[in-house]
Curated annotation (Swiss-Prot):
Its cofactor is Mg(2+). This is Cell division control protein 7. ATP binds at residues 39-47, 76. Present with 1600 molecules/cell in log phase SD medium. Keywords: ATP-binding, Cell cycle, Cell division, Kinase, Magnesium, Meiosis, Metal-binding, Mitosis, Nucleotide-binding, Serine/threonine-protein kinase, Transferase. The keyword Thylakoid does not apply. Coiled coil: none annotated. It catalyses: L-seryl-[protein] + ATP = O-phospho-L-seryl-[protein] + ADP + H(+); L-threonyl-[protein] + ATP = O-phospho-L-threonyl-[protein] + ADP + H(+). It comes from the Eukaryota. Belongs to the protein kinase superfamily. Ser/Thr protein kinase family. CDC7 subfamily. Its EC number is 2.7.11.1. One of its GO terms (molecular function) is metal ion binding.
């Protein structure tokens, strides 16, 4: 999707037919919106660019329209194959999320029988594939800052997006603004820690349902990672309640009553089936999702941010291309090593074995993510795929000195060209120092995003406080500390709309 509008003659006939059919399926919509073109398509929906004929939407949600005076909106047609609950969930979350300039709000929703559309602002932006190889470190900083600001707002509502990826974060390079879209897979985060605050609570949680009987679902959602805080070094119980499988039965050690799980499972199955929400896009899913952790949190979105940042620094997209969960874990092994993956698996009560690998580094890259990115860039520099003016050489130069010359955060940079005057030489040296510092702190953020333990992985709010974003944060607050950012500001007209105008499908 870009800011350019196609000529009607350039629109393919099949797209024209789709738009005519949409008018037919939703009678009366032609009086409010004029369809312009189809701008996107996914598994569960299609998105069309349209003109807001009445001006009602563009007026009430003016802060969300980046081009002043724009009257374009996006109509998202949700396919009838989507379950009613899924449709309700997405519309309801969009409704709840209204209030941030970095999250696309639900402006309107219409339903005729099984046909449902959601009306959102139209955001002119550039496709990620067109700029990820050329975005300088300052642009990378702004991109990730905008994304983390959006996630900070979403996570503050207790919502997990679950599908963070470049196509769901629309970024306008000229304006330096981004917006998070597509809440089709989003869900509320469960408060597992309050559900299981002690060993006795664990017994009740694992073995009973709301009616006082056994709940299979509770066992499927339980993950040993929830109980780690109960077994800290200061705790009297140094060994967590292990679970073993014997003849189709789950036996909880430490004098916890066993529960027969034979019913509903294969008769001779000796392994407890582990179920968890694995929704998301391959290549962007966190280890706990791949390992079917039942206690997933907003931290899975932070891992996805790390994948995007890795693509920007390594100038490669997509970064991971595995077709299944097992291959996804092996891809992580090549970077972090199978020993790290084994530790991660143990957090979730799993074992992890990897044999016959061509890449046989149990500890992964010795210098971690810096060495991995250096390896990616070095290969491209060797074969000459970067143009001579590429900003990738700034990252490559930083890593070259960081890994091989072992320079400090304030390196002795090369002297500027001798034919420069003193002012130009000073400005160049200052620029070089800023670039070096930005890269140093950027890799700190990257490492925090890729923390294997979700409880230790930084939140969006924590990442925004890192030195990497200092210069952007300074522009966000007044001297007295009052926020000047529009992120949490809702106009009075938008607030009124929340109460009056948008009617959602009832559960």
């Amino acid at each position: 999707m870009t800011s350019k509008t196609k000529n009607i003659d350039d629109i393919p006939p099949e797209i024209k037919e789709e738009m005519i059919q949409l008018y037919h399926d939703l009678p009366g919509i032609e009086n409010e919106y004029k369809l312009i073109d189809k701008i996107g398509e996914g598994t569960f929906s299609s998105v069309y660019k349209a003109k807001d004929i009445t001006g009602k939407i563009t007026k009430k949600f003016a802060s969300h329209f980046w081009n002043y005076g724009s009257n374009y909106v996006a109509l998202k047609k949700i396919y009838v194959t989507s379950s009613p609950q899924r449709i309700y969930n997405e519309l309801n979350l969009l409704y709840i999320m209204t209030g941030s300039s970095r999250v696309a709000p639900l402006c309107d929703a219409k339903r005729v029988r099984d046909q449902v559309i959601a009306v959102l602002p139209y955001y002119p932006h550039e496709e990620f594939r067109t700029f990820y190889r050329d975005l300088p470190i300052k642009g990378i900083k702004k991109y990730i800052w905008e994304l983390l600001r959006a996630l900070k707002f979403v996570h503050s509502k207790g919502i997990i997006h679950r599908d963070i990826k470049p196509t769901n974060f629309l970024f306008n390079l000229e304006l330096g603004r981004g917006v998070l879209v597509d809440f089709g897979l989003a869900e509320a985060q469960m408060d597992y820690k309050s559900m299981i605050s002690s060993q006795n609570d664990y017994d009740n949680y694992a073995n009973t349902n709301h009616d006082g009987g056994y709940s299979m679902r509770n066992h499927e959602q339980f993950c040993p990672c929830i109980m780690r805080n109960q077994y800290s070094p200061n705790s009297h119980n140094q060994t967590p309640p292990m679970v073993t499988i014997q003849n189709g039965k789950v036996v909880h050690l430490n004098n916890v009553n066993g529960v027969d799980l034979t019913k509903g499972y294969p008769k001779n199955e000796t392994r407890r089936i582990k179920r968890a929400n694995r929704a998301g896009t391959r290549g962007f899913r966190a280890p706990e999702v791949l390992m079917k952790c039942g206690a997933q949190s907003t931290k899975i979105d932070i891992w996805s941010v790390g994948v995007i940042l890795l693509s920007l620094l390594g100038r490669r997209f997509p970064m991971f291309q595995s077709l299944d969960d097992a291959d996804s874990l092996l891809e992580l092994c090549t970077i972090f090593g199978w020993k790290e993956l084994r530790k991660c698996a143990a957090l979730h009560g799993l074992g992890f074995e990897a044999s016959g690998l061509i890449w046989d580094k149990p500890n992964g890259y010795s210098n971690g993510l810096k060495e991995f990115v250096y390896d990616l860039l070095n290969k491209e520099c060797t074969i000459g795929t970067f143009p001579e003016y590429s900003v990738a050489f700034e990252t490559f130069g930083f890593l070259q000195q960081e890994l091989h010359d072992r320079m400090s955060i304030e390196p002795q940079l090369p002297d500027p060209k001798t034919n420069m005057d003193a002012v130009d030489a000073y400005e160049l040296k200052k620029y070089q120092e800023e670039i070096w510092s930005d890269h140093y702190w950027c890799f700190q953020v990257l490492e925090q995003c890729f923390e294997m333990d979700p409880q230790k992985r930084s939140s969006a709010e924590d990442l925004l406080k890192t030195p990497f974003f200092n210069e952007l944060n300074e522009n966000t607050y007044l001297l007295d500390g009052e926020s000047t950012d529009e992120d949490d500001v809702v106009s009075s007209s938008e607030a009124d709309l929340l109460d009056k105008d948008v009617l959602l499908i009832s559960e």
